[in-house]
UniProtKB/Swiss-Prot annotation:
Segments of this protein annotated with the region Interaction with substrate tRNA: 61-64
Residues flagged as site, Interaction with substrate tRNA: 127, 149
UniProt gene name: miaA
Gene3D superfamilies: 1.10.20.140, P-loop containing nucleotide triphosphate hydrolases
Protein family: Belongs to the IPP transferase family.
Residues spanning the membrane: none
Chain residues that bind ATP: 36-43
Free-text function comment from the UniProt entry: Catalyzes the transfer of a dimethylallyl group onto the adenine at position 37 in tRNAs that read codons beginning with uridine, leading to the formation of N6-(dimethylallyl)adenosine (i(6)A).
Enzyme class: transferase
Protein name per the record: tRNA dimethylallyltransferase
Quaternary assembly: Monomer.
GO BP of this protein: tRNA modification
Binding site for substrate: 38-43
Length: 339
């Protein structure tokens, strides 16, 4: 995995709320955030936006960091990456771990590099907790309690990991919305923190120290398409991924050892087909597995929308009647007005 920048990297992000404020002082220190649920079109919009603001894109996707996870993550093509520079894509092998803290230091390092060349960082993605960490600093938390962790691991075996996830949803719905009910390690660690301290995991992340210098100014937009359009996009997206060779990609990842990484192997679009292949690819289960893939993707988009709508930094942009160019121009105009 690529080396991270030092832990002393500058942080501190502020929202620019005054359109009349001169952007001459802040212009090249402003970071654009473009978020949205899976299938909202944020990648396509970002590729139109980058040339308008002389920007480079930083991926905010917890799975696009992995080499070989291309089709199932809708990773931007190599041709598009040649046209618009991208960062935090293909950072590590599927057997390596990569978490929010790793993302934070990589993203800050990328921002500093982009800004040093007088260009604009554009953070694009749908992983809410990574945006959260970028804005507030790396999550802090108590030291591991291995006795409690072992107890929770036994509970997971006895009650099932879904039962522990339901408990987490009740105790810390904000954090629970950022992970899946299959992410055993994160669920157990979250409950370990909650039971040990009585505090929510999400509150630890937001309480991280923010640099008083407010070196960066963040402007956030949330693509928020109509639910019916989003559902249509997801159906098309899942079909397209299968046509492009998702099953072959999963086979290659199994050979590369993806099962050694619980986060990567449980990612939506991969876990369903890993299970299918493990069962010997029975033809009668193909359509059932495909429906699971679609359903799980749709459920995840609902969680994404819930998370982003709770974050006041993002201003909603509804694509109804707008082309990709229209949306990119709208964001660019707002950006130049505020800086």
């Amino acid at each position: 995995m690529s080396s991270s920048s030092s832990s002393g990297a500058a942080t501190g992000f502020a929202v620019c709320s005054d359109p009349q404020k001169s952007f001459s002082k802040m212009f090249k220190r402003t970071v654009i955030l473009l978020a949205g649920p899976t299938g909202s079109g944020k990648t396509a919009v970002s590729l139109k936006l980058a040339p308008l603001v002389d920007g480079e894109i930083i991926s905010v996707d917890s799975m696009q960091v992995y080499q070989g996870m291309d089709i199932g993550t809708a990773k931007v093509s190599l041709a598009d990456r040649k046209e618009v520079p991208h960062h935090l894509i293909d950072v590590c092998h599927v057997q390596e771990s990569f978490n929010a803290v790793d993302f934070y230091y990589h993203a800050v390092q990328a921002c500093q590099d982009i800004l040093s060349r007088n260009k604009v960082p554009i953070l694009v993605g749908g992983t809410g907790f990574y945006f959260h960490t970028f804005l507030s600093g790396p999550p802090s938390g108590p030291s591991p309690d291995f006795v409690l962790r072992e107890q929770l691991t036994l509970e997971a075996q006895e009650r099932g990991i879904s039962a522990l996830y339901q408990e987490l949803e009740l105790l810390d719905p904000v954090y629970a919305a950022t992970i899946t009910k299959h992410d055993k390690n994160k669920i157990i660690r979250a409950l370990e923190i909650i039971r040990k301290t009585g505090s929510k995991v999400s509150s630890y992340a937001w309480q991280s120290t923010v640099n008083e210098s407010k070196e960066y100014h963040c402007r956030g937009w949330l693509l928020s398409p109509d639910p019916e359009l989003l559902r249509h996009n997801i159906l098309e997206r899942c079909d397209q991924m299968l046509e492009e060779g998702l099953l072959d990609e999963v086979q290659a990842l199994l050979a590369a050892g993806i099962k050694g990484n619980s986060s990567a192997s449980r990612a939506i679009g991969y876990r369903e087909w890993i299970e299918f292949l493990d069962l010997g690819s029975p033809p009668d289960l193909f359509e059932i597995t495909k429906q699971k893939f679609i359903t799980n993707t749709w459920r995840y988009t609902k969680k994404q929308r819930t998370w982003f709508k709770r974050c006041s930094l993002f201003r909603e942009l509804r694509p109804m009647g707008m082309t990709l160019d229209d949306m990119a121009k709208k964001i660019a105009q707002d950006y130049f007005l505020c800086g």
